[in-house]
Amino acid sequence: MTTHEQIINYTIKPHGGTLINRVVEGEERDHLLEAAQSYKVITLNPWSISDLELIGIGGFSPLTGFMGVADYTKVVEDTHLENGLVWSIPITLPVTEEEADKLEIGDDIALYGEDGELYGTLKLEEKYTYDKKKEAQNVYGTTDEAHPGVKKVYDKGNVYLAGPIQLINRPKHDEFSDFHLDPAETRQLFHDLGWKTVVGFQTRNPVHRAHEYIQKSALEIVDGLLLNPLVGETKSDDIPANVRMESYQAILKNYFPKDRARLVIYPAAMRYAGPREAILHATVRKNYGCTHFIVGRDHAGVGDYYGTYEAQELISQFEDELDIQILKFEHAFYCEKCGNMATAKTCPHDASEHVHLSGTKVREKLRNGESLPTKFSRPEVAEVLIKGLKQN
C-alpha cells in the first residue's frame, strides 16, 4: 500500500525534507476565524499575500513563516538560511514604523488583504529594521531605483515582522482554478501519472518557439514537463496572466503529447532578481516535485542588469546543495539555413541566418496588432495573444 509519505517523496524530497503545510481547515479554521476577530490587524499588499500563500501551501518549504533577523541576514549575506540550507531571496513581511510601534512581541496578528479579506495570522516573534541598500545590492545586484525589484525594496516599510503563519483563506485564482494545484497536489499528480522525473519551466512570458524547443529538448530526457507560469504581480508592461494562460493552453494542446506535459500556476510575485531569483525558482519547483529545472538566458532578468548567462553561473555553484538537476540552455533561435530551431551549440551558421525576436519587440508587435513570424511563434499562440491584448 502506498503511503502519503511515499507519494510526497515519489520524485524528490522537498527542500529541507518536509513539505510544510500551514493551511488551517475544519474546526481549527472555525476557531481561528473567531479568535482572529480580537487580534491586532495589519493589511498586506498583493506581494506579501502571495508570499503568505506560498509559505502556507509549502511552496516555500522549509519556511513556516516570515523570516526572522538571523535567517534574513544569512540569506542576504550568504544565500543560505541559518540552518545551512540554500535560500536566495528574503521572504519578509514589511510594515511602517508606525504600524510596528503598535505591535508587541507575542501578539497574534490578523493578516488582511487590501480587498478586506482575512487571509491568515502571524504569531509575532520578532520585529527588526534592515538596510535597504544592502538588501538591494546583495539580492538584486544593484541599488538603481529604476530596477523594479529594487524600487519595491525602497518603497517598503522600514520594519520587518517575523514569526510563524497560519493560512486561513486562499487568494482567489478563480479564472485559473483548473490549473491551481498546491505542491502536495502536483506531487500526487506526478505519482498518478507515473512520472519519476519531471522538469519544471518557469515563465512570465508567452511560450514561443525558442521556449518550446528548450522544453522539448528537456522532455527527451525526463518523463514529464511542468509548465509553471508565474501569475502573481508583474511589471505593468508584461503580458497579463489571463492572456498568457490561454496561450500556454494553445501550445500544449497543439504541440505537446497530452500525457507528457501539465500546466499549473505559480502564484508568486515576480521579483526580477535575476541570478538570485533563479535559485528561488529552482527551490520552489523542487517543492512542487520537479527533479529537473530549466535555466535559460537571462533567467528572471530585467533590462540589462544581468549578464546573459549570469543566472546559470550562480546556480551552478549551488546545484549540489539544491539537489535538483539544473538544465542550462543557450539562447535558442530559428536558423534559416538549418530550417529549424537551434542554439550556438548545434548550429554552425552565421548570425545573419538566425531569427531572434526579443520579448520587448514581441510585446510591441502584439500591441500594434501585427502578426508574429511563424518561425518565432506558433500561429495558435500568436492569435491568442493578439486577440487577448486587444481585449485588455
Curated annotation (Swiss-Prot):
- Entry superkingdom: Bacteria
Q: Which family does it belong to?
A: Belongs to the sulfate adenylyltransferase family.
Q: Name one Pfam family in it.
A: ATP-sulfurylase
Q: Which GO terms describe its molecular function?
A: ATP binding; sulfate adenylyltransferase (ATP) activity
**Catalytic activity reported:** sulfate + ATP + H(+) = adenosine 5'-phosphosulfate + diphosphate
Please provide the Gene Ontology terms (biological process) for this protein: hydrogen sulfide biosynthetic process; sulfate assimilation
Q: Does the keyword Transferase apply?
A: yes
Would you indicate the residue range of the signal peptide? none
Which PANTHER family does the UniProt entry name for this protein? PTHR43509, SULFATE ADENYLYLTRANSFERASE
**Is Protein transport one of the keywords UniProt gives this record?**
no
Q: In which pathway does it act?
A: Sulfur metabolism; hydrogen sulfide biosynthesis; sulfite from sulfate: step 1/3
Protein name, as recorded: Sulfate adenylyltransferase
UniProt EC number: 2.7.7.4
Entry-linked InterPro entries: ATP-Sase_PUA-like_dom (IPR025980), PUA-like_sf (IPR015947), Rossmann-like_a/b/a_fold (IPR014729), SO4_adenylyltransferase_pro (IPR020792), Sulfurylase_cat_dom (IPR024951), Sulphate_adenylyltransferase (IPR002650)
Record keywords: ATP-binding, Nucleotide-binding, Nucleotidyltransferase, Transferase
